[in-house]
């Protein structure tokens, strides 16, 4: 871990340089491939890891090799992972989904912004230097129309987004021919339905049933379609965002690009400092993944941070502002009801959710019901007009393992289930947020409660952290819980960085959190038995046994760290072909010994076989030629 401390000016300059010099970049020995769909503009990006051949025999002068298949893997990096694409952050990404949105002919461009706050910001000349220049003209559903993927799914329509997702979720595994790579252990899916091949129709069915969501605001056409549901690959979210005391627009854009490079399936912008509106615009226009927000944070900024001064009108204006910018999902803390707040009084750590504490304070100061709950149907109407998915927030999640699975937590969860059914009346897509801090033996109940009371809507959890004793290592404590709940059926895991409980994460913290959570998600996919999940593991194991070091580095989730740690002790190029590593050395390497045992066994088999043939030859009289009936 670097101990160099940069000044704020240096941090901003470094981030600006990153943005100015940004190019599409492939991982080592990987190439970007595109798998096409039924129409020419459905081109699904994947990363294909190229592997070296295996030495199978021959001589030093004439070695014989066997080719190893390239391994295709899911890729969230968008254009940033394609060396052939010219990147210009000032212009934003190509509008991949715009033709699909336009072809449906159920939305229209607005003459003006619906949000008074947006109009005010656009009229402020003092913000010109901060503002993204290529602003989109926002769209909204035509009168009487709903533009959500749930609406289309319920009406039997398979959208291009659904076909894109089906191809993406299959991860190119149909390209793999090797039986060694295709081998997979049966999983234990806890009732999840995992088909051998994911079809566009299966995607439609899952969305129509509410078991999966496709976060895809019509005003975020730059995003590449993805799906969140327990019958699909487990997804990972990364949080970024500035605060009142640190970070800048350029640093947040840098973190966005960095997060997608390291596997973030979605990104939440949790900015609470200055220029929230402008920061979000830059992020959206440059994001290939769905963007989520917590609108109450910005609404609070609009009333100078005084929770008691929040109003439905200010919050509604914020929803319109963000929906027309292109936010793909809102976290809404509508389940924090007035009658639940006293339940938290006997907790060790009270209410730890920022959104939950804001709404609890508002309810108590006015002695009124949560205005998000009271106006929930109006929230749904707004979401239906732009296809903003709802992430129903767990404002009463436990902030310590002592408070896990208590009355307040599950009371709110049951209310979120009631709100889910209301949202579905408006064809609004919904996922449910979950904890938090939960010891291992209490995790599964969270999943079963959610499935039962929230009608199988996708679950999205923060960890959970399984112990409270490891500040600085909470990406580990939560990664354990994340792997478990992902196995039990959680659809998306919100990453936790090493800075959790300590400070705002920087670029390196984002990477560490994502790698930890990609491990957790992948472990869950293996345990569930997701088809094709084991291919990369098998390829790695084969490369490891055959001492193909370069392939081991390249197959790793983090090739750079794998290579660096190997080279700390064996930096020479000869170390990349050595049949040992520095852990055991050349004489005690278990895999080298195993290979020798295997070679010896094979030689013994040949020798025994030759002896048997010799004995058989002598038994038949030692004649070179035999009569036909004797053969």
Curated annotation (Swiss-Prot):
Give, as in the UniProt entry, the pathway in which the protein acts: Cofactor biosynthesis; thiamine diphosphate biosynthesis
Q: Where does substrate bind?
A: 239, 268, 297, 333, 353-355, 394-397, 433, 460
Q: What enzyme class is recorded for this protein?
A: lyase
Q: How does it assemble?
A: Homodimer.
Q: Which organism is it from?
A: Salmonella schwarzengrund (strain CVM19633)
Binding locations of Zn(2+): 437, 501
Using the record for this protein, list the coiled-coil segments as residue ranges, or answer none.
Answer: none
Q: What is its EC number?
A: 4.1.99.17
Write down how the cofactor binds this protein: Binds 1 [4Fe-4S] cluster per subunit. The cluster is coordinated with 3 cysteines and an exchangeable S-adenosyl-L-methionine.
Does Transport appear among the keywords? no
- Stored PANTHER family: PHOSPHOMETHYLPYRIMIDINE SYNTHASE, CHLOROPLASTIC, THIAMINE BIOSYNTHESIS PROTEIN THIC
A GO molecular function annotation here is: 4 iron, 4 sulfur cluster binding
**What family is this protein classified in?**
Belongs to the ThiC family.
Q: Name one GO biological process term.
A: thiamine diphosphate biosynthetic process
Name of the molecule in the record: Phosphomethylpyrimidine synthase
Output the Pfam families linked to this UniProt entry. ThiC-associated (PF13667), ThiC_Rad_SAM (PF01964)
Report the InterPro entries cross-referenced here. ThiC, ThiC-associated_dom, ThiC/Bza_core_dom, ThiC/BzaA/B
């Amino acid at each position: 871990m670097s101990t160099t401390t940069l000044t704020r000016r240096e941090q901003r300059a470094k981030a600006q340089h990153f943005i100015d010099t940004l190019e599409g970049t492939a991982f080592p020995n990987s190439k970007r491939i595109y798998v096409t769909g039924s129409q020419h503009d459905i081109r699904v990006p994947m990363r294909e890891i190229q592997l070296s051949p295996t030495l199978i025999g021959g001589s030093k002068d004439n070695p014989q090799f066997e080719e190893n298949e390239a391994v295709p893997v899911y890729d969230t990096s968008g254009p940033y992972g394609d060396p052939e694409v010219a990147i210009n952050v000032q212009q934003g990404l190509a509008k991949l989904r715009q033709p699909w949105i336009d072809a449906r002919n159920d939305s229209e461009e607005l003459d003006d912004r619906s949000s008074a706050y947006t109009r005010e910001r656009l009229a402020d000349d003092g913000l010109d230097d901060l503002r993204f220049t290529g602003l989109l003209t926002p769209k909204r559903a035509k009168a009487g129309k709903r533009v959500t993927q749930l609406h289309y799914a319920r009406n039997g329509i398979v959208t291009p987004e659904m076909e894109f997702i089906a191809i993406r979720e299959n991860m190119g595994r149909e390209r793999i021919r090797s039986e060694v790579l295709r081998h997979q252990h049966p999983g234990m899916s806890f009732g999840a339905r995992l088909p051998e091949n994911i079809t566009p129709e299966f995607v439609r069915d899952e969305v129509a049933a509410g078991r999966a969501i496709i976060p895809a605001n019509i005003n975020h056409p730059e995003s590449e379609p993805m799906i969140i549901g327990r019958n699909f690959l487990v997804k990972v979210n990364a949080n970024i965002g500035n605060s009142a005391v640190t970070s800048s627009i350029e640093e947040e854009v840098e973190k966005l690009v960095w997060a997608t490079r390291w596997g973030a399936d979605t990104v939440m912008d949790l900015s609470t400092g200055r220029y929230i509106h402008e920061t979000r615009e830059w992020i959206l226009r440059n994001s290939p993944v769905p963007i989520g927000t917590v609108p109450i944070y910005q609404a609070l900024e609009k009333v100078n941070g005084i929770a008691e001064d929040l109003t439905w009108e200010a919050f509604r204006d914020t929803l319109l502002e963000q929906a027309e910018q292109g936010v793909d999902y809102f976290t809404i803390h509508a389940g924090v009801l007035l009658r639940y707040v006293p339940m938290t009084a006997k907790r060790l750590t009270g209410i730890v959710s920022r959104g939950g504490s804001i709404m609890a304070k508002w309810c108590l100061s006015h002695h009124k019901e949560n205005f998000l709950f009271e106006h929930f149907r109006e929230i749904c109407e707004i979401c239906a007009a732009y296809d903003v998915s709802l992430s129903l927030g767990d404002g009463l999640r436990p902030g310590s393992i002592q408070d896990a699975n208590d009355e307040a937590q599950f009371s709110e969860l049951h209310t979120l289930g009631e709100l889910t059914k209301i949202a579905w009346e408006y064809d609004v897509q919904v996922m449910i947020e979950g904890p938090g801090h939960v010891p291992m033996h209490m995790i599964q109940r969270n999943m079963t409660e959610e499935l039962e009371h929230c009608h199988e809507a996708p679950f999205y959890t923060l960890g959970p952290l399984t112990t409270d004793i490891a500040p600085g290592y909470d990406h580990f404590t939560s990664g354990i819980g994340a792997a478990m709940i992902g196995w039990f059926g959680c659809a998306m895991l919100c990453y936790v960085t090493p800075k959790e409980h300590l400070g705002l994460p920087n670029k390196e913290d984002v990477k560490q959190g994502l790698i930890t959570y990609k491990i957790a998600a992948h472990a869950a996919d293996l345990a569930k038995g997701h088809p094709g999940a084991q291919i990369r593991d098998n390829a790695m194991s084969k490369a490891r046994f055959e001492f193909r070091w370069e392939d081991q580095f390249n197959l790793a989730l983090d090739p750079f760290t794998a290579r660096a740690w190997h080279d700390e002790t064996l930096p020479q190029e000869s170390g990349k072909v050595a049949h040992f590593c520095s852990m055991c050395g050349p004489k005690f390497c278990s895999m080298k010994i195993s290979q020798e045992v295997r070679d010896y066994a094979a030689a013994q088999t040949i020798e025994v076989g030759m002896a048997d043939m010799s004995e058989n030859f002598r038994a038949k009289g030692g004649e070179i030629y035999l009569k036909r009936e004797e053969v």
